């Protein structure tokens, strides 16, 4: 996108490290099996703030709280090693985090020719320029896991773009990271944090598989995973088709109309389930014109309660489920039937996914997002809890990169009510879906 590259200028990179040296007792952080399942995926977050909110803020003001933040989140400043790979990170063993205080990257940039409103009116894929393009490797032992990009616009407003390696944690974790950064900026005291590990997962780590009866339950390969060719120390996937991003903006009025259309007066259904069912059917119609319908979809949810909003979690809250449309043609079946399947007939594969990774000693390479058509529930994510000077962003969004060919759909809260639906799908499907959503539902 040459026209976008010219809009972004004065790019500067620097590093921020923890304010204090990490102690010897914290020098190594073990990844859970679910962390390693997610290692080829990356979370991209983007926030926009108006001029009056950020006026007078300098990069020093934005970086200063990070020193304290990284004391709390010390593993995030580390670098990935393998248990037989030495300081360079190479080798073929199970990855772990060496907490060596190497830091996170901070990116400063300017957009001198566009206001925030003008940028938001541009193509969705242009947003990628505001979030640093991050991949781990091929020098794995020297690759930062987090990039934070601050971009100032012609109007004086600013965007914050977070690139977060999914191996660190899910979208809720990434959101917590930024929310706590903002709290530290205004002087709020934060209790010591650390990357929580799931007890159900930790008991699998470093156990002898032959003596662990739990592992015997994994008899079949999970539908929610796709094994990919070994990637070595360059953690990226290669798509066979061109993928494209797009966002659907569903107002509260449109959401109410959709719920009423699908379920009538039975409002006990969850908006996420209805949105997923609607898009599943629409995409089945689009794909049915030239290929097979998606009969199995993956549902990813974050099992977060109120107690987790003030801790740094790993991926242990992630639940991975599949839904199969047996003996029905998805493009013809009533949307309410698909809603019922998603709400009541999901098969939780989280445990067998973790067990599979443990059996393979954490070294095999899989994808989750895009192995099947994948729906991600971020309705409860606190993305609008990030406040600067007491003001919320005018727009916030999360997306996933490193997505398989089947695509991913994220459902997020919308500031004014309703939902934002972010799509990463094969380019051919995007146009067909946009047309059907516009014609049948009036949603753009």
Language model features: what each stretch is:
Residues 36, 145-151, 405-413:
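Short, surface-exposed beta-strand/loop micro-motifs that present aromatic residues
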Residues 2, 38-39:
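Position-driven detector of the extreme protein N-terminus
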Residues 368-444:
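Low-complexity, glycine/alanine/valine/leucine- and proline-rich hydrophobic stretches
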Residues 29-34:
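Detector for long, low-complexity, acidic/polar
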Residues 12-26, 39-75, 79-372, 376-380:
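Soluble acyl-CoA-dependent acyltransferase catalytic core bearing the H(X)4D motif
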Residues 1-11:
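PEST-like, low-complexity acidic/proline-rich intrinsically disordered segments
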């Amino acid at each position: 996108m040459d026209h976008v590259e010219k809009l972004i200028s004065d790019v500067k990179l620097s590093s921020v490290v923890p304010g204090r040296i990490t102690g010897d007792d914290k020098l190594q952080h073990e990844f859970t099996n679910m962390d390693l399942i997610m290692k080829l995926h990356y979370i991209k977050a983007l926030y926009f703030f108006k001029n009056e909110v950020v006026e007078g803020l300098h990069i020093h003001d934005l970086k200063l709280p990070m020193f304290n933040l990284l004391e709390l989140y010390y593993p995030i400043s580390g670098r990935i090693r393998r248990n037989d790979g030495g300081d360079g990170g190479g080798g073929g063993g199970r990855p772990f985090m060496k907490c060596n205080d190497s830091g996170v990257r901070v990116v400063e940039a300017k957009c001198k020719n566009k206001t925030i409103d003008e940028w938001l009116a541009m193509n969705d894929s242009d947003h990628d320029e505001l979030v640093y393009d991050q991949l781990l490797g091929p020098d794995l032992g020297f690759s930062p896991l987090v990039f934070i990009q601050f971009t100032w616009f012609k109007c004086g407003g600013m965007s914050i773009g977070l690139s977060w390696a999914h191996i660190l944690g899910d979208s809720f974790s990434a959101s917590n990271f930024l929310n706590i950064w903002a709290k530290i900026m205004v002087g709020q005291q934060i209790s010591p944090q650390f990357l929580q590990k799931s007890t159900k997962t930790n008991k699998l780590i470093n156990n002898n598989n032959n003596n662990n009866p739990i592992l015997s339950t994994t008899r079949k390969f999970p539908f929610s995973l796709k094994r990919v060719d070994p990637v070595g120390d360059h953690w990226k996937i290669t798509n066979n088709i061109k993928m494209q991003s797009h966002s659907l903006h569903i107002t509260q009025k449109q959401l109410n109309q959709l719920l009423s259309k699908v379920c009538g007066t039975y409002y006990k259904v969850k908006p996420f389930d209805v949105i997923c069912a609607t898009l599943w059917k629409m995409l089945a119609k689009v794909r049915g014109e030239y290929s097979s319908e998606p009969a199995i979809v993956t549902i990813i949810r974050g099992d977060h309660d109120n107690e987790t909003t003030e801790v740094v979690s790993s991926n242990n809250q992630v639940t991975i489920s599949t839904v199969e449309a047996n003996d029905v043609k998805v493009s013809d079946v009533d949307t309410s039937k698909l809603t019922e399947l998603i709400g009541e007939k999901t098969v939780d594969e989280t445990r067998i996914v973790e067990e599979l990774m443990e059996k393979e000693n954490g070294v095999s390479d899989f994808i989750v997002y895009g192995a099947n058509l994948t729906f991600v529930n971020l309705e409860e994510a606190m993305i609008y809890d990030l406040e600067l000077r007491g003001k919320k962003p005018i727009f916030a969004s999360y997306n996933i990169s490193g997505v398989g060919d089947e695509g991913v759909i994220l459902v997020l809260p919308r500031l004014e009510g309703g939902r934002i639906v972010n799509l990463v799908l094969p380019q051919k499907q995007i146009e067909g879906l946009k047309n059907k959503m516009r014609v049948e539902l009036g949603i753009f």
